[in-house]
């Protein structure tokens, strides 16, 4: 088995930037984009709307579109992308070993760019109403039919909280912004925007202490510093209260700080283990910006290239750049109808295809519910399509846009995006919320195929 020069684990701004620089240095990097521990391919920018502070985009750019452009640039310079799942990392021997979807990859150098995941409040009632009114991603779940014209709440006082509060006014009103202090931590521009929005009500010096309701969230309880309490009747509660670094894969191997962030040399990407570098939010507890993550990815790649050269480990692969695929000019989605439905197609779109395959096809049917602004949906769909391609026609898939077909989503009990439902013989066999490992979907379908319908 050939040993890789450099493997990058993680595909946010840090991971893609590291890959771009490493590829331009002819290091032939391998970037593992798949479901990272606690994160999603593309990083946190996949769960944002307009990014307005990334240089070069004076009118702003959608987070998922920015990551598409980063991916295209990495591919242009020869980065090899592995859309698989990093399951384990072993730094105890050289070359380092990474287990990916059951196979082992060996590498001389490693850049860890696994990012961070959203924090929870751990409220009484939180587990019961998670995905039934409580969410950590307004951009993913805001279009859920149950939130239409309902009162909603966002917890937090930073840029993300303010952005999500303003974004949610597209769907519900009023939107209550719950801030635990007497001021916002957000940038001045974002703070001014949320204060000026008449559909946003700010509650200062308040904590959410309980969530309650029936089958769906109906209310939250706020508490003031003096112990006074107030009940807010809301159908949705969205968390924007910071993040925890995704470091489980290297716990006990790399030095971490008290909050779990990877410790590196001051101002540099090197970790305590030679040949291992960290970039982006996994090692940044202070700045946590897309542009700083990209900069740290650049640093990590340059440091890795120098380290490999110094130890005479680099095997250079000369490769000219290729023309990048156009990004931002996606083809319009064709919704299946009676005129264009192909009953043998692996992937189709719309409720007509769903009804037809649900009633007529004997094969397992994956139904994925998405929304236009859902970054994780953007990540998940290629993984599901890959599963169906591997199965070579033994299963099929349908995509439903919950904004365009909200009635279908409501009938299906969909409470956020992405949601995936697996059917066979008109029976719901399994359901998932959020991005999961590709192998999990494959195993579920394999289990159905192993048992006669």
Give each language-model segment a name.
Residues 378-391:
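Typically the conserved alpha-helix immediately C-terminal to a functionally engaged Cys/Sec
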Residues 421-453:
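Non-catalytic, surface beta->alpha helical segment in thiol-disulfide oxidoreductase systems
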Residues 20, 162-164, 279-320:
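A conserved FAD-binding loop/helix module that cradles the flavin
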Residues 3, 122, 128-146, 240-287, ...:
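FAD-site-proximal beta/loop scaffold in flavoenzymes
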Residues 4-77, 160-188, 257:
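Beta1-alpha1 glycine-rich phosphate/pyrophosphate-binding loop at the start
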Residues 346-364:
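A short beta-strand-turn-helix
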Residues 369, 388, 392-407:
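Thiol-based oxidoreductase modules, predominantly thioredoxin-like and allied folds used
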Residues 74-92, 98, 105, 170-266, ...:
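A Rossmann-like FAD-binding core segment of flavoenzymes
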């Amino acid at each position: 088995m050939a040993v890789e020069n450099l493997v990058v684990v993680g595909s946010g701004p840090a991971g893609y930037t590291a890959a771009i620089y490493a590829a331009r240095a002819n290091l032939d990097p391998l970037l593992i984009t798949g479901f990272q521990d606690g994160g999603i391919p593309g990083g946190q920018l996949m769960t944002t709307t307009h990014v307005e502070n990334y240089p070069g985009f004076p009118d702003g750019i959608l987070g998922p579109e920015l990551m598409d452009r980063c991916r295209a640039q990495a591919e242009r310079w020869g980065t090899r992308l592995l859309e698989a799942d990093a399951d384990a990392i072993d730094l105890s021997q050289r070359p380092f070993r990474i287990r990916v979807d059951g196979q082992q990859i060996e590498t001389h150098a490693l850049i860890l760019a696994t990012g961070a995941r959203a924090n929870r409040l751990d409220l009484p009632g939180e587990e019961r109403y998670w995905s039934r009114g409580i969410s950590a991603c307004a951009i993913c779940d805001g279009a859920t039919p149950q939130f239409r014209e309902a009162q909603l709440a966002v917890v937090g006082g930073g840029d993300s909280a303010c952005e999500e509060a303003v974004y949610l006014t597209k769907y519900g009103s009023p939107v209550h912004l719950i801030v635990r202090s007497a001021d916002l931590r957000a940038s001045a521009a974002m703070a001014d925007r949320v204060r000026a929005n008449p559909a946003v009500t700010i509650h200062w010096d308040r904590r959410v202490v309980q969530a309650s309701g029936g089958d769906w969230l109906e209310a939250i309880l706020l508490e003031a510093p003096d112990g006074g309490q107030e009940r807010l009747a809301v159908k949705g509660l969205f968390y924007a209260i910071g993040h925890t670094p995704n470091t489980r894969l290297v716990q006990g191997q790399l030095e971490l700080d008290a909050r779990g962030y990877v410790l590196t040399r001051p101002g540099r990407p090197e970790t305590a283990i030679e040949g291992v570098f960290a970039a982006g939010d996994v090692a940044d507890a202070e700045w946590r910006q897309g542009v700083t993550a990209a900069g740290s990815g650049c640093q990590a790649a340059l440091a890795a290239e120098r380290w490999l050269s110094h130890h005479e480990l680099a095997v250079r692969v000369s490769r000219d750049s290729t023309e990048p695929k156009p990004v931002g000019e996606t083809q319009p989605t064709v919704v299946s109808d009676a005129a264009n439905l192909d009953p043998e197609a692996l992937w189709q779109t719309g409720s007509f295809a769903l009804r037809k395959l649900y009633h007529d096809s004997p094969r397992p049917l994956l139904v994925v519910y998405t929304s236009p602004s859902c970054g994780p949906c953007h990540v998940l769909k290629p993984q599901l399509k890959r599963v169906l391609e591997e199965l070579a026609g033994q299963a099929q898939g349908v995509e439903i846009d919950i904004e365009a077909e909200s009635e279908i989503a409501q009938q299906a009990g969909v409470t956020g995006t992405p949601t995936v439902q697996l059917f066979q013989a008109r029976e719901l066999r399994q359901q998932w919320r959020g991005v999961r490992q590709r192998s999990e979907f494959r195993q579920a379908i394999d289990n159905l195929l192993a048992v006669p319908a």
